[in-house]
Amino acid sequence: MFSLRPTALVSLSVVLFSIQETLSEQQPFVSPGWSDQWWHKSELESYTFPWPIQKVAIIGAGPSGLAAYHELDKAGYDVYLFERDTVPGGNWHYTDETPVKEPIPNADVSIGDFVPSLPPEGVRLPYEEHYEGNVSDELLRAHRGPKPIWNSLQTNAPPPLQQFRDHPWPADQPWLLPHAVLGKYIRAFASFNGINSNDVENPHISYNTRVELVEKCFTSTENGPMRTGWTLTLKQVSRTGTNTSKAVWTKENFDAVVVATGRFNAPYIPNILGLKAWADRFPDRIVHSRQFRRPQLYTNQTVLVVGAAASGVEIATDIAPNARAVYLSIRPRRISNSNSAGNPLSSRWMGRLPHNVSVVPEIKRFLPPTSAIALSSVELTNGTILTGIESIIFATGFRYTFPFLPQFHNTSLTNHDLEHKPKPIVTDGTHLRNLFLDILSIEEPTLGFMCMNIEIQNFKYAEYIAVALSKIWGNKATIPPVTRLWELNERRVMEKGGYGKYFQFLGFRGEREMIRLFTGWLNDAAASHGGRQVR
């Protein structure tokens, strides 16, 4: 998703390939492991929603959440947008403030992003609490969740690949954009739709508001409780003075919910032998890459960067001019002749690393810490012992997590365990399960998800998902009945070789095939039921 200045060199061929793929003539549609045009069959046998869908909650005001709001609002839904941060933008809202430091070892994935904060049991809502001093500051920071981008970060794709279709960039934009420019573009799109944080006249937007819990909603009837949607528990935190703040909890009911919280919320740090002892002994010297902001912090230090995906390579490159030396620890399989964006350390790129960046093997263990981190030792898988390390940055990625959906987490399951009801969406955090097209819960098709795939152009892909959700929930596009959805899901798992880290991976070709699927399905639906077509 992210990239620094060197990407202008190392990803040019990848981006050119993407543009070529986008502009090329459409090939005959090939289903990417889902089915043989299931939508033709679903006209006679389709899922029926148990209640009409009109009022929709969107969780998250990043690019995908804004795209969802734009489409659903245009389609006539009663849409509400909730964002924990102060402004829209998602991961493209940069601040010097860093997130709350992650625990080592990792927290359980179900609370990997945050621990839900619920009002005391039995209190009447709305319920308020007031805070002051350091408690207030830390509450605000934890509540809004500063994003994992750094000061010098630039986009890894040109503007035409990172834009909303109805709001193209001017033609004279540079090839790569500073994060601040893209952030302004996203906020401008929000303003155009009347959903920026300063659009105070819009009662349907709530910034500084975190969704703490999403649970089933029931209505009392003569025949007993009847399921009618979802109840959201909301917590809005606002500053009331220089060092004071207040939190207000409320609840609200919705017919459907869109999860647009992204994939970069719960940091992952591998559980390497001896690491916990180092983290306990040197807590300020071992961080996840989401804490990184400026390279000057590492001036004249010897730094160990762990991870060879985009963030690891580019953080190592960014700090190299300031650092004494940088070690980049990678798994051997990460060096290849591939030009894939999934292999940032291809052999063609190795020579472009700064002279003081040394690529080293994977870490085997951290030897028992001594009185100072620089006097302590790290053993690599090839037997090499590193000493003199003064800081460690784990650029080892993130895990899927939705703390507000505890009923859809089951971290006790492995990739090979059989599932039991309720079927989880999140297990170990490396992938998502039991979603149709990765956009709808199979058990609860009024629960939608935006842009949860890996290696996609989020702006473009989000618009197809938003149209799909709009048409499905408005009965202008059909999906198969739940039994058929489970059959398709089982086929997909089998074709993918089981669950795992790359279960949601699409890449350029996979994204192109999915867009063809959306186009064929949704345009067939438009011909049958009316509504706009997609292209």
UniProtKB/Swiss-Prot annotation:
Disulfide bonds: none annotated. Induction: Expression is highly induced during artificial growth in symbiosis with Populus, which is close to its natural condition. InterPro entries: FAD/NAD-bd_sf, Flavin_mOase-like, FMO-like. FAD binds at residues 60-65. Its EC number is 1.8.-.-. Residues 1-24 form the signal peptide. Keywords: FAD, Flavoprotein, Glycoprotein, Monooxygenase, NADP, Oxidoreductase, Signal. It holds the Pfam family FMO-like. Pathway: Secondary metabolite biosynthesis. One of its GO terms (molecular function) is NADP binding. Belongs to the FMO family. This is Flavin-containing monooxygenase iboF. The lineage of its organism: Eukaryota, Fungi, Dikarya, Basidiomycota, Agaricomycotina.
